[in-house]
């Protein structure tokens, strides 16, 4: 990722974490990494672990974010959720889900749209 895209992605993850926290989510980790990859945000909400994929785009409809997750990315996110459970010695029946937070930034930085899509990624 280029420097500009990295900065935009980092900014988006910060905005997403704040957005979720304001809605009662407890943010447990950001940029959690293992050999399988990275989870943008790990949170807890209403007893569930919530793994959050953040999609930050410039000048695009935020609704396109969930559709932008390929089957390969879906499989990777599912594997990452399993890896997180294993790394933290959590039982396999721990309730969890994968959400998407889509952030769209307009041509002017003041034009920001945030959309939270619970259960956006499910097994195919």
From Swiss-Prot:
This is UPF0102 protein Rcas_2007. Gene3D superfamilies: 3.40.1350.10. One of its GO terms (molecular function) is nucleic acid binding. Belongs to the UPF0102 family. It comes from the Bacteria. Disulfide bonds: none annotated.
């Amino acid at each position: 990722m280029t420097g500009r895209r990295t900065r935009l992605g980092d900014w988006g993850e910060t905005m997403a974490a704040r957005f979720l926290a304001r809605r009662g989510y407890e943010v447990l980790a950001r940029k959690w990494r293992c050999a399988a990859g990275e989870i943008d945000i790990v949170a807890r909400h209403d007893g569930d672990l919530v793994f959050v994929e953040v999609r930050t785009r410039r000048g695009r409809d935020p609704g396109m974010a969930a559709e932008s997750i390929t089957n390969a990315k879906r499989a990777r996110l599912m594997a990452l959720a399993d890896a997180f459970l294993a790394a933290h010695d959590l039982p396999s029946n721990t309730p969890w889900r994968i959400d998407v937070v889509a952030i769209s930034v307009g041509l002017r930085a003041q034009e920001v749209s945030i959309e939270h899509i619970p259960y956006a990624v499910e097994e195919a």
